[in-house]
Amino acid sequence: MTDLILKNAELQMKETIDAYVIHLRQIRTGKASGAILDKVMVNYYGSLMPLNQISQITTPEPNLIIIKPYDRNVITEAVGAIHKADLGLNPISDATLIRIPIAPLTEDVRKNLVKKVHKELEGYKIRIRNIRRDAIDEIKKVENISKDLISDNEDKIQQITDKFIKQLDDLTKEKERELMTI
């Protein structure tokens, strides 16, 4: 029973790491990446659709994103959605595609993004710790379990937690390095 609780906690922590990776990919680094547009939702014939599902997004140059909507009629809606997403991007549209030049980030913007990443890191660490707390509470509720077994499982949960917290820290350091590299 306790093994199931441990596996479930580890799975939840892994999902938290995956969510953090997705979040980090969406932070602008001064290099063109289609991932920064992942959360952009476009009004597509009355329903909101992710931009990456109604268009082809490419990065032919390190400082340029090109969006080719599958339907030309959605270009103005897509440009509006990109502006509305408040990503600090300035899309330029023509008849068939949208170009988004990516300006290099200033040092102040880079430092603010690093602060933002560290703030987000704390939120994800709290999620991991909450999973640890919930798992320990579940283990304590198991009937006919000795105090030694509870203690052993608490140690195992802590080791798992430490492993995932270290992964979060490593991902953050990597993103910080990427942000501060000009």
UniProtKB/Swiss-Prot annotation:
Cellular compartment(s): Cytoplasm
GO annotation, cellular component aspect: cytoplasm
Species per Swiss-Prot/TrEMBL record: Mycoplasma capricolum subsp. capricolum (strain California kid / ATCC 27343 / NCTC 10154)
Keywords carried by this UniProt record: Cytoplasm, Protein biosynthesis
Described purpose of this protein according to its UniProt entry: Responsible for the release of ribosomes from messenger RNA at the termination of protein biosynthesis. May increase the efficiency of translation by recycling ribosomes from one round of translation to another.
Main location: cytoplasm
Superkingdom classification of source: Bacteria
Family: Belongs to the RRF family.
An annotated GO BP: translational termination
Lineage: Bacteria, Bacillati, Mycoplasmatota, Mollicutes, Mycoplasmataceae
The protein's name: Ribosome-recycling factor
Classification via InterPro entries: Ribosome_recyc_fac, Ribosome_recyc_fac_dom, RRF_sf
HAMAP family: RRF
GO molecular-function terms, A-Z: ribosomal large subunit binding
